């Protein structure tokens, strides 16, 4: 199972995520309590293995701001977590994860518009919040999302495949913890999972929870 640990700010946590076996590390550039600067991320990335998949998270940021952050920090991928249009995916030049906030089945129809993405991160819609809500998504909606994309002729990446543009990976996010991620994977059958607050204590990353989350996610038999 592909696992992304998001909202990293400190070297010890990033190193722990890599050592635990996470497939991708997320750094939030959008205004939030987890926000980091391009310079800070460059310093963090410099201490990680060169093959580490590092993802910058942006919310409705100008394209020039995204490109500047990518250039300064050395990111390997970008996550668009706002209301960015499908054409934004082709303007970045890196694999793109597009976050989609889901209210219900009616929101699934627009997923094929983002067919050029490397990942589609599905999370529950919460008014006024772009991610980090701690709310869980109905697993049925993830399975329906896969069916919607398959009917539209969009090939999907499996849980053991890397981020590949044009072959989006369905990534489950929202309310996941070391205690519930295995059950969530079994029920939703996603191509990956993403966690931030679920591996924290009091808003601070907990290394033991990072290890436990990755182990639980990757221990699920499919």
Swiss-Prot record:
It comes from the Bacteria. One of its GO terms (biological process) is L-tryptophan biosynthetic process. It catalyses: N-(5-phospho-beta-D-ribosyl)anthranilate = 1-(2-carboxyphenylamino)-1-deoxy-D-ribulose 5-phosphate. Signal peptide: none annotated. Its EC number is 5.3.1.24. CDD domains: PRAI (cd00405). Keywords: Amino-acid biosynthesis, Aromatic amino acid biosynthesis, Isomerase, Tryptophan biosynthesis. Pfam families: PRAI. InterPro entries: Aldolase_TIM, PRAI_dom, RibuloseP-bd_barrel, TrpF_fam. One of its GO terms (molecular function) is phosphoribosylanthranilate isomerase activity. Pathway: Amino-acid biosynthesis; L-tryptophan biosynthesis; L-tryptophan from chorismate: step 3/5. Belongs to the TrpF family. This is N-(5'-phosphoribosyl)anthranilate isomerase. It comes from Symbiobacterium thermophilum (strain DSM 24528 / JCM 14929 / IAM 14863 / T). The gene is trpF.
